[in-house]
Design a protein with these regions (language model features):
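Conserved nucleotide-sensing/catalytic segment adjacent to the nucleotide-binding pocket
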Residues: 165-236
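Positively charged, proline/Ser/Thr-rich regional signature most characteristic
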Residues: 15-88
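Conserved NTP phosphate-binding and transfer environment spanning the P-loop NTPase/kinase superfamily
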Residues: 235-354
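A short glycine-rich beta-strand->turn/loop micro-motif centered on a GG-aromatic cluster
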Residues: 94, 116-130, 172-177
Length: 354
């Protein structure tokens, strides 16, 4: 029997050594957040965990443990039959639950008695979460940041994608958050991660970055949709050198009509989101936008959204929060196309190399 216990810090340093990372918590807990690359083998599923918890409160711990053990044994047997039967002798799994207790302990004990070299995460997910929160500021502080600024529709995301495609280091917070970071930024069909999940995604994206090379990041606000950017990252961004991406208004409108095509295809959804802006622009102005959109005049509304709402708010935020924005290097692609962004990215990287 081989069963080893490691601290969260040790596990993080050795994650690459495990053949599988097994989360023994319920599917609901797993969905909220989990270790990178983890698979979910619930010792108790959502309903079972709720029922056992009720038994604990309404009867007593002994009866709850008996019932829980019976359910857990069946579930572990099912996982072994489905997932473990064909594993080789040298398979090395890591297992964890909420606090590294009974759920992952039972699974780990059985796997180790089979003959596998099993590692148990001491303190479980709770310890991992604490380690991630502690580690993010350290990782952020080791990196050299280049902040891509620019008004809405200037192509910041396209430029980041072009930079990444050409080998640059990029941290795309909007991609991690499944949100385009504005009142109209929700992406249909894509739910945002929980705050804990977002933190883990950011942390995991930071880990492989090379401290000797700059990292490009968009000038995000403190929140991207419903999730908050780690404070240490916000602070680092606001003190780092900036690039100011500039496009003519007509190009910005064209880009937004492409990237937000789902609004054009679902006018009522667009109108629903526009109504949120009544608080900021007034009911009369928004009513005019709604009428224009429903009449098919979308481009003029987008133009007014930029000049009357997004641009003033964005520029005020940049000047107030990003200390080096005033001295930002202005960069201008020839147009809003992907090809133009690729060309601009190439120029930027060439300039960095010289």
């Amino acid at each position: 029997m081989s069963l080893t216990t490691l601290s969260a810090t040790e596990v993080i340093a050795r994650l690459h050594e495990f053949d599988s990372v097994i989360d023994a918590r319920s599917e609901g807990e797993f969905e909220e957040d989990h270790l990178p690359g983890a698979v979910n083998w619930p010792t108790l599923n959502n309903d079972e965990r709720r029922d056992i918890g009720t038994l604990y409160k309404q009867v007593n711990a002994f009866e709850a443990k008996k019932r829980g053990a019976a359910i857990a044994a069946r579930n572990i047997a099912s996982h072994i039959e489905r997932e473990v039967i064909n594993k080789p002798r040298d398979w090395k799994p890591l297992a964890y639950c909420w606090r590294g207790g009974q759920r992952s302990g039972a699974l780990s004990l059985i796997l180790s008695q089979i003959g596998f070299r099993v590692t148990l995460l001491e303190g479980g997910y709770k310890a991992f979460r604490a380690a991630v929160v502690h580690d993010i500021p350290r990782l952020v502080g080791t990196l050299e940041w280049r902040v891509v600024c620019g008004t809405t529709g200037s192509g910041k995301t396209r430029l980041l994608q072009a930079l990444a495609a050409q080998g640059a280091q990029v941290l795309d917070l909007e991609a991690l958050a499944n949100h385009r970071s504005s009142v109209l930024g929700a992406i249909p069909g894509l739910a945002q991660p929980t705050q804990k999940r977002f933190d883990t995604l950011v942390w995991n994206a930071l880990r492989p970055l090379d401290v000797t090379r700059p990292v490009f990041i968009e000038s995000e606000s403190k929140k991207v949709g419903n999730v908050s950017v780690p404070p240490s990252l916000i602070e680092a961004m606001r003190q780092s050198p900036c690039l100011n991406l500039v496009l003519p208004d007509a190009e910005r409108v064209a880009l937004l009509l492409e990237d937000y095509a789902f609004f054009v295809q679902d006018i009522e959804h667009f109108c629903e989101r526009l109504q949120v802006l009544a608080e900021f622009r007034g009911k009369v102005v928004v009513a005019g936008w709604l009428a224009s959109v429903r009449a098919g005049n979308i481009a003029p509304v987008v133009q007014q959204l930029l000049t009357q709402h997004y641009d003033p708010v964005y520029l005020q935020s940049m000047q107030r929060n990003f200390l080096r924005f005033e001295n930002a290097k202005v960069i201008s692609p020839s147009d809003h196309s992907v090809a133009a962004m690729n060309s601009l990215a190439q120029q930027l990287l060439q300039n960095l190399a010289t």
